[in-house]
Amino acid sequence: MENLEQKLAGDGRYVLEVRDDKMIDANIWDGNFVVADANKAAKSGDIVIALINNDEAVLRRFYKLDDRRVLLMCENKFFKPDIFSQNDIAIQGVVVGVFSYPK
């Protein structure tokens, strides 16, 4: 059996707990855990961890609009997408897995 801890974390991967409902249409729920890869370059359409203005880390779908702007989109119809200057965000990792623990 493979060591689950080694598979989930290490080599630039880390695990975060989801604390909102903004990605439910991507089947990522409040209380789930996401595995992010900090070494993977974000492509349009990827779900990412983005740091906004060096202040707030968010889980969003990423779209590069042009050389200066990106769109960060929730996967929940009740929230509008946000457009940012690339200077205002830093991609911290691309989501490569989602899991939950039974409660």
Identify the meaning behind each predicted range.
Residues 40-41, 55, 77-78:
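Short acidic/polar capping segments at secondary-structure boundaries
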